[in-house]
A protein has these predicted regions:
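Post-signal-peptide, soluble extracytosolic/periplasmic N-terminal scaffold domains
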Residues: 31-145, 230, 234, 342-347
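Short, surface-exposed coil-to-beta transition loops
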Residues: 49, 78, 169, 741-744
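Bacterial N-terminal signal peptides
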Residues: 13-26
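N-terminal secretory signal peptides that target proteins for export/translocation
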Residues: 1-12
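Outer-membrane beta-barrel proteins and related beta-barrel translocases across Gram-negative bacteria
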Residues: 104, 110-120, 127-150, 154-156, ...
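Alpha-helical interface/anchor segments and their boundary "cap" residues
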Residues: 2, 29-30
Length: 781
């Protein structure tokens, strides 16, 4: 039907159309407002949740208000308000913005991101890097591709809180997560107060091991003057690294050093280090020796160094393995002069023991380098190696190396491991064949070969066990000749020699025990008992042991002396011992609500061994009786360990003369510890001049005897934490016999959340040192 046009009809229809459109928009908005979740577009969509969602412009824009959460997997974004652009996959967030994108933790007042590329910007933004515990903030932050950020007016710190103890302010900072932070026009602030500036600075922003400068070490030493050390750590790969040390000492000069570590697998590891010093303070008389001016030694060399290291591993892909220790030093004073420096003896010794479980020689002993390759089969092993022992004072103005009487060794060993000869018999064989070329610059040198088979027979008796052992030792020497001087060991035994020495031993052992049950001490697994501990049983064991060992007297004075085993001393001894062991069964309640449990463990609070013996050879001794009379009854021996509670341990080793001469040797120690307050350890050791007379009286002649001066050594170590962030340390070691102090060391440490400050004063030998150490945990420069 046709309707003629009229103004009134047109206005009416236009009004109806507008009302219909408004009604439609109102209905759409109302529907959106009723929703609280939507999913974004794309292959990896996000889920948007909020208290209120509103669609605008036909769904092109979605506004979210209240508890906004945008989430995809482990990535998320939280805010008070969000505006999401559906066609471009961009989102604008505002108000208490918190986000995680990959490894990045972000905070901002407002931000805008491309959800596809994860790029964007932040206003008043910050990121937190968990690995080094680093905060980076800026007025304007651009998030670039990957894990890179560009900060304007940046602030970098590892400290929690609004006013950090230290921070770095920069006009611009470029940060890459698990990479580096590059700062330009930087200022170091202490409590937000500027201290010192730098035009450019690079920091690691890594969550893994990173290359970079380590914290410096500085202080003052009366021997070396003011010192300053800056190490640089270089990561080679996940299993290897290098550390370069630059140490300057005002009295000694510049000492560079390098340390290499490798640990590719559990049984394949290496640690090597080398320090070098061009020292202008050489001296040609002992009066110029600042370390020890009473030993008669000098040092005329300017090039000083120390090479040390250890290694274990496999030779290629074969079944052959190797092991070596390196320890070679330029002079007798190097280790003592720099023992407490960052690359000194104490640091190297601890590092090697932690990595290999092996120790260096004491600082004042000869240096020993040795190594060998070996192959281990089921019952057979072959090894070939070397051993070099260095006397550090030789050369550089002292006794020349041509006068060195120390034995250097190239050994070959064949081992036959312990095993039964016949399955039907319990008889077991253990054998060793060894051969070595023994070299010394001055004195007898030559080939030493030894065969040492040994048989053992375990015997089960009623209520006891017995072990019988017997062996022979056949040794051959083929040595050079030199003029014999009886008091000089290195001149003895030229030509072809041999010796044959049998040995045997018998050991009788039994055990008796008794158990006391304490059911009344049982702890129920309840909330009231959580953390409580109780003894619920005791077992006492007594282990008597009687041993007899025999090695006949054999004249070996015509043989060379390359090692201590070239003088096997005669021995015919009986020893009786009783070992008491108290074992406690302990119950402890642990767990959380609804899952309490009672655990059981065992420990030995008391262990006590007492023993004495009789030396048959000593009873018949005719040599040196004018020097020291016969004493066949061996010292009464006692060794006691007490660990009744977790916070207390005591131990004592005691030797008492059976001839009324009192204590000949003792070692006593105690430790009290508390996880909150600290600990105290004390040890006391004594030695009588003749405490080891039984061995010394069997030497070839008087010149071979070594009796030590009486000693009484007291060591105290205290650690005290009056507050959780302050620690005090004190250690002292004194020889009570001579009144001489060997060491005094005091240190105080302040441990803040984002820095550690440690100061120490140490007096050791002739060196008084003062040191300040600043540590920034998790952060290197």
């Amino acid at each position: 039907m046709f309707f003629p046009f009229s103004p009134s009809n047109f206005v009416s229809r236009l009004f109806l159309a507008v009302c219909a459109a408004l009604l439609c928009l109102s209905s759409s908005a109302a529907a959106a407002e009723g929703q609280k979740s939507l999913t974004t577009r794309g292959e990896l969509p996000w889920t948007l949740n909020a208290d209120k969602l509103v669609s605008l412009e036909d769904g092109v824009i979605v506004e979210a208000t209240g508890s906004v959460l945008l989430q995809r997997g482990e990535d998320y974004m939280k805010a008070d308000f969000a505006r999401y652009y559906t066609t471009t996959n961009w989102i604008f967030v505002q108000g208490h913005v918190e986000a995680r994108m990959g490894r990045d933790m972000l905070n901002a007042a407002e931000a805008e991101f491309d959800l596809t590329s994860r790029t964007g910007w932040l206003k008043d933004g910050s990121i937190f890097i968990a690995g080094p515990h680093m905060y980076v903030t800026g007025e304007k932050v651009d998030k670039l591709f990957g894990d890179r950020y560009l900060f304007k007016n940046a602030k970098v710190t590892a400290c929690d809180g609004d006013v950090p103890a230290w921070s770095l302010a920069a006009e611009q900072a470029e940060i890459e997560i698990d990479g580096y932070a590059k700062l330009s026009h930087t200022t170091l602030n202490i409590l937000d107060m500027p201290l010192v500036g730098s035009p450019f600075l690079v920091l690691p922003a890594k969550t893994t091991r990173q290359s970079g400068l380590l914290m410096p070490d500085f202080g003052y030493s009366s021997l070396n003057g003011a010192f300053f050390s800056v190490p640089y750590f270089q990561v080679i790969d996940e299993s290897r690294d290098l550390t370069f040390y630059s140490t300057y000492m005002s009295r000694a000069g510049f000492m560079p050093g390098i340390e290499y570590r490798s640990h590719t697998r559990d049984q394949d590891k290496t640690w090597l280090a080398f320090d070098f010093l061009y020292d202008k303070h050489k001296f040609s008389t002992e009066k110029g020796d600042r370390i020890n001016d009473t030993d008669g030694k000098v040092n005329t060399n300017e090039e000083r160094f120390w090479l040390r290291g250890m290694g274990d591993g496999f030779v290629g892909d074969s079944g052959w393995r190797y092991r070596y220790n390196l320890d070679y030093v330029s002079d007798q004073n190097f280790l003592r002069q720099f023992r407490d420096m960052r690359t000194g003896f104490n640091h190297s010794r601890d590092a090697l023991y932690d990595m290999f479980g092996r120790d260096l020689q004491e600082v004042d002993k000869n240096r020993v380098s040795e190594g060998f390759v070996y192959r281990d089969w089921d019952r057979f092993m072959v090894s070939l190696g070397f051993r070099y022992e260095q006397i550090p004072y030789l050369g550089h103005g002292n006794t020349p190396h041509s006068e060195d009487t120390t034995v250097q060794r190239i050994p070959l060993n064949l081992y036959l491991f312990k095993g039964r000869m016949l399955e039907e018999l319990p008889l077991e064989l253990q054998g060793e064949v060894s051969s070595a070329y023994e070299y010394r610059a001055k004195g007898i040198r030559g080939l030493r070969t030894e065969i040492h088979p040994e048989l053992s027979l375990p015997v089960n008796l009623p209520g006891a066990s017995m072990l019988l052992t017997g062996g022979i030792r056949q040794t051959y020497y083929n040595s050079t000749h030199t003029e014999l001087v009886d008091s000089q060991r290195w001149t003895r035994g030229g030509g072809t020699k041999d010796r044959f020495i049998p040995d045997m031993s018998a050991e009788l052992f039994t055990q008796a025990s008794r158990v006391w049950e304490m059911p009344e001490n049982h702890l129920e697994a309840t909330a009231e008992n959580v953390g409580r501990t109780s003894w619920t049983g005791l077992r006492h064991r007594v282990q008597p042991r009687l041993t007899y060992a025999w090695t006949p007297e054999k004249d070996q004075s015509e043989n060379p002396i390359f090692e201590e085993m070239d003088r096997i001393k005669p021995s015919q001894r009986l020893r009786l011992s009783f070992t008491n062991i108290l074992t406690a069964r302990r119950e402890t309640v642990s767990g959380a609500k609804g899952n309490y449990k009672t655990g059981t463990s065992y420990f030995d609070p008391v262990r006590w061994e007492i023993a004495t013996g009789y030396d048959i050879d000593e009873a018949e001794r005719t040599k040196y009786r004018n020097l020291y009379g016969r004493r066949p009854w061996m010292d009464a021996y006692s060794y006691l360990e007490l660990r009744p509670v977790n916070w207390l341990s005591l131990w004592n080793r005691l030797y008492v003369s059976m001839y009324g001469e009192g204590i000949t040797r003792s070692d006593t120690g105690a430790t009290l510890s508390n996880a909150r307050w600290g600990s105290w350890s004390v040890s006391y050791s004594t030695r009588d001049k003749y405490y080891n007379y039984l061995d010394e009286m069997k030497r070839d002649n008087l010149s071979d005897m070594r009796f030590t001066s009486p000693q009484r050594l007291l060591t105290n170590t205290f650690t005290f934490r009056p507050w959780s962030n302050i620690s005090l340390y004190y250690r002292t070691q004194d020889n009570i016999e001579t009144g001489k102090n060997y060491e005094r060391h005091f240190a105080i440490g302040y441990y803040h959340q984002c820095f550690h400050l440690i100061g120490s004063i140490q007096n050791k030998a002739r060196d008084n040192s003062y040191r300040v150490i600043l540590e920034l945990p998790g952060l290197n420069f």
